[in-house]
Amino acid sequence: MKRLSSVAVLLALAGPAVAGDLLSVYQEARVSDPQYGGARASYLAGQEKIAQGRAGLLPQLSVNGSVNYTNLDARFPGSTFFRGGQHDFASDSFGVQLTQPLFRPINREIYEQGKLQARASEIQLNAAEQELMVRVSQGYFDVLLAQANLEFIRAQKSAIAEQLAQAKRNFVVGTATITDTNDAQARFDLANAQEVGSLNDLEVKNRALATITGKYPGGLAGLASPVSLLAPQPADIGAWVEQALGSSLQVEIQRVAVEIAGREIEKSKFGHYPTLDAIASYTDSKANSSAQGFGNALRQGVIGLQLQMPLYTGGAVSSRIREAVANKTKAEQDLENARRQSALSAQTSYLGVTSGLAQVSALRQALRSSEVSLESTKLGREVGVRTSVDVLNSQQQVANARKDLAKSLYDTILAQLKLKQAVGRLNEEDLAAVNRLLSKQ
């Protein structure tokens, strides 16, 4: 009772529960998962790189102005024209300048890099979405497996309790020894301990899923029975590896990174190039007095070209070129690493699916055999050739077979999703296909 009370308190503190199937939990996670939310924000930030890069190619308009008060003590020895002495006067000016870049190759490279960075942020968001699908599925099936384990243990505990009661009755009437009772009691105590551990494991798995969805899970749909899983198509591990090398999102991200690094080399080289801008400006200034003793008003309009040619930068440009070349080499190595990791991921997931399907088939047969063996053992006990301990062992074997089958099913489904993720093709329709394997409990 104390354990159940503790669980009730934990449930109350967990907040609103989210119930439903895999798709509904995924939709909840899209809204609430902080990792995916951060990826969305990064995507929006990355898209701004295009506008920022384009700005360097467009006209720049600026305005300036000033208002000044001057106190001047002037002396003009020997001058009969200029008045010396103390002068106080105010002045103000206003100006507008328009600059249009005509030749700024660095700005062009920044714009091209911005487009690539925006593309990279889009791919990263897609990768984050696929990763969210896998994390939600993993968390969802972890909860289902923990629930199944708890159900198996409770069923086993119930069967042991019946055997314990029967052993006690048989001992009283003299048809069984105290050994049978002690053995059943030991198994019952162990089942109690396993139940406590399973309850804790279920709580941990529920809370792990809640960190993704923001809500405590409740009433999740489980796998329907029977479940039919399909083999990967094409049934060729090499074909899946080729797809991963060509369309893996991690590989695509690194390809874009190599392009960006190449653009950075070109941008650095353009540090040796001149720049040319078209300039147009207008200035209006006036003062009510001056050192000469009279005021002035000036209006000036200027239009022209401004050329800047770097002659010597202390070796900074050459250093930046070497740095950019080294960074591109690193990006190329990162690309190769991404290709190898994607190939390994595709191979691992493919083998996980194929071996999982074989294991599911074998475990189904093992479960059928265990159930037949249990019935035979029960019959043997009735005729006196088997003991209650034999029945308990057979029941434990059935429970283990069911638990192993459930885990194998969940692992195989996850491997199927990860295989699609490895080749960059995991989408919501794949989750919908898994969802169709579920039924409300």
Residue ranges, per PLM feature:
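Amphipathic alpha-helical coiled-coil segments
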Residues: 38-53, 128, 132-152, 162, ...
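N-terminal signal peptide c-region/cleavage motif recognized by signal peptidases
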Residues: 14-15
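Sec-dependent signal peptide recognition
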Residues: 2-8
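A glycine-/polar-enriched beta->alpha junction
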Residues: 27-37, 44-59, 95-113, 123-130, ...
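Periplasmic alpha-helical coiled-coil/stalk elements that build and connect Gram-negative outer-membrane
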Residues: 3, 131-243, 349-352, 356, ...
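Small/polar, glycine/serine/threonine/aspartate-rich low-complexity segments that form flexible
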Residues: 64-100, 223-234, 266, 279-316, ...
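Transmembrane beta-barrel architecture of outer-membrane proteins
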Residues: 24, 91-93, 138, 183, ...
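Amphipathic alpha-helical coiled-coil scaffold segments and their short linker/junction regions
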Residues: 26-30, 215-281, 429-441
